[in-house]
């Protein structure tokens, strides 16, 4: 009965709202921060910020030993054992000790790698000037970014979701209070200090809460380090996956910088932020609620009952994703001519059509993302990596081809095409390996919302947003999508 309740539409809606609202608060604060950042840095400064942020993401993903993800599973196993046997509660502290020890080692490793690769990163990223010192100065930021990842894993594994929500809210507010005056006074020279302050505050806030759960400590003895090898083996697949995704982001930005300039990178990054962050609130529930529920379904790949239960879990999450995201994406596509000047300024209107096209990708992501969790939930790391490799290569090829064909607008089209192909590929792959079948209900929801988005795209490319017909027809289409989703959700949760 408990499993059925956890997989119910009402449960999914409840926790999507909970985690989405937490992220929504961060986004609202982020809107103000991005507005002032764009004002004080401009498109070129935003491009520079994007390149340094991508570098931090790539190096921290490559050097963190996969602890932010594998650490959750590693500690959670001990937590579950402790629930069954009081004598095993000490294992939780031991698991946390290992996570913190390897997080510290990974942090030093990441900082050293950053220093050593500084000249290489400069040559690969910039075709002008010498930014080697800037890349080297990112080392402390990477150090605290990796440390923060370890503390986040501890909070997730021990069920401290309220603390995580509080930490995220405080971090967003503090970053706003710090970054705006720094960018105002120092301009582009303030980018590196702000990135460091962000990483340090994230670690400090996480540590503030995690040390209440388990007292801080590390152990560098050989016996302790050897005991942590399972943690490293588990994290290997996550390291490669994170590295591929971060590397994809870095390669695309470096390509745009080489083929265009920092302004192009800044416009691209701003558009991607709107699409993937603001439209992605619905996805915030996936790691926190959906993945644990899916992982809790036992049985082999071919076990008929297990296959049915997994299909039910995935399809209900997918259906709710599509119903919630359809109206949001339609409204974003229609409202971007107003959203961009509010979030940034008039200089960023060059990303309008790119962002409108890329937004369609979010509907495809709503479909394939729950399905892509199947290999992870089964512990099939090799299949997960094969799937991720295909998707990353596909995205790089489509974005580069799109830019060559139609500039920045082509990049947006390339993203939408890549996500559409990825959806089809994931459906075929998951059916062959896991026996997954998309529900008829989910298929109908997808087709309806996709047609709505195509209607909105036709409107925004054929009618000027300065024309009143643009807004009249657009609002009617968005209301159609909203009404459809509202009626279907109300029916499902009854």
Explain the meaning of each model-derived region.
Residues 97-126, 176-180, 184, 286, ...:
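Alpha-helical transmembrane segments of multi-pass membrane transport and lipid-handling proteins
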Residues 53-57, 101-250:
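Hydrophobic transmembrane helix module of multi-pass membrane transport proteins
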Residues 64-83, 157, 215, 271, ...:
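Helix-loop junctions and terminal segments of transmembrane helices
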Residues 1-12, 204-249, 289-312, 433-447:
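Interhelical loop/hinge segments that connect adjacent transmembrane helices in multipass membrane
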Residues 143-167, 359-390, 430-432:
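Membrane-interface junctions at transmembrane-helix termini in multi-pass inner-membrane proteins
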Residues 14-31, 46, 171, 194-206, ...:
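Transmembrane helical elements of multi-pass membrane transporters/channels
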Residues 1-30, 90-97, 131-132, 210, ...:
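N-terminal membrane topogenesis motif
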Residues 2-3, 457-494:
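Membrane-proximal transmembrane or re-entrant/amphipathic helices at the cytosolic face
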């Amino acid at each position: 009965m408990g499993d059925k309740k956890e997989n119910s539409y009402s449960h999914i809606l409840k926790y999507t709202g909970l985690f989405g609202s937490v992220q929504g608060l961060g986004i609202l604060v982020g809107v103000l921060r991005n507005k002032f950042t764009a004002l004080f840095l401009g498109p070129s400064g935003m491009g520079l910020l994007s390149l340094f942020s991508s570098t931090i993401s790539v190096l921290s993903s490559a050097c963190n030993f996969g602890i932010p993800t594998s650490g959750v599973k590693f500690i959670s196993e001990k937590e579950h054992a402790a629930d069954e046997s009081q004598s095993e509660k000490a294992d939780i502290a031991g698991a946390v000790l290992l996570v913190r020890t390897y997080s510290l080692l990974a942090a030093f490793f990441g900082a050293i790698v950053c220093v050593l690769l500084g000249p290489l990163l400069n040559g690969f990223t910039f075709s002008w000037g010498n930014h080697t010192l800037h890349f080297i100065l990112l080392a402390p930021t990477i150090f605290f970014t990796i440390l923060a990842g370890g503390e986040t894993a501890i909070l997730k594994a021990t069920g401290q979701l309220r603390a995580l929500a509080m930490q995220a809210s405080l971090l967003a507010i503090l970053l706003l209070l710090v970054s705006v005056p720094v960018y105002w006074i120092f301009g582009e020279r303030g980018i590196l200090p702000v990135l460091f302050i962000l990483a340090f505050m994230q670690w400090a806030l996480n540590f503030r809460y995690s040390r209440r759960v388990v007292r801080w400590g590390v152990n560098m003895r050989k016996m302790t380090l050897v005991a942590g090898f399972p943690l490293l083996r588990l994290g290997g697949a996550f390291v490669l996956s994170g590295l591929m995704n971060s590397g994809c982001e870095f390669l695309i930005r470096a390509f745009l910088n080489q083929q265009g300039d920092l302004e192009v990178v800044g416009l691209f990054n701003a558009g991607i932020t709107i699409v993937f962050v603001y439209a992605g609130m619905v996805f915030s529930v996936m790691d926190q609620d959906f993945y644990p529920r899916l992982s809790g379904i036992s049985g082999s790949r071919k076990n008929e009952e297990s296959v049915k239960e997994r299909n039910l879990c995935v399809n209900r999450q997918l259906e709710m994703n599509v119903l919630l995201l359809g109206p949001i994406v339609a409204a974003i596509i229609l409202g971007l001519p107003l959203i961009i000047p509010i979030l940034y300024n008039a200089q960023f209107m060059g990303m309008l059509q790119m962002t409108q096209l890329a937004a369609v990708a979010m509907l495809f992501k709503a479909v394939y993302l729950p399905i892509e969790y199947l290999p992870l939930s089964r512990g099939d790391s090799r299949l997960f990596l094969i799937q991720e490799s295909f998707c990353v290569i596909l995205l790089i090829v489509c974005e580069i081809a799109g830019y060559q064909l139609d500039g920045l607008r082509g990049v947006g089209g390339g993203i939408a095409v890549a996500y559409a192909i990825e959806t089809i590929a994931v459906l075929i792959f998951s059916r062959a390996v896991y026996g997954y079948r998309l529900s008829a209900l989910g298929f109908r929801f997808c087709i309806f919302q996709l047609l709505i988005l195509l209607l909105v795209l036709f409107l925004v490319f054929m009618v000027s947003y300065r024309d009143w017909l643009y807004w009249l027809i657009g609002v009617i289409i968005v209301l159609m999508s909203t009404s459809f989703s509202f009626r279907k959700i109300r029916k499902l949760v009854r």
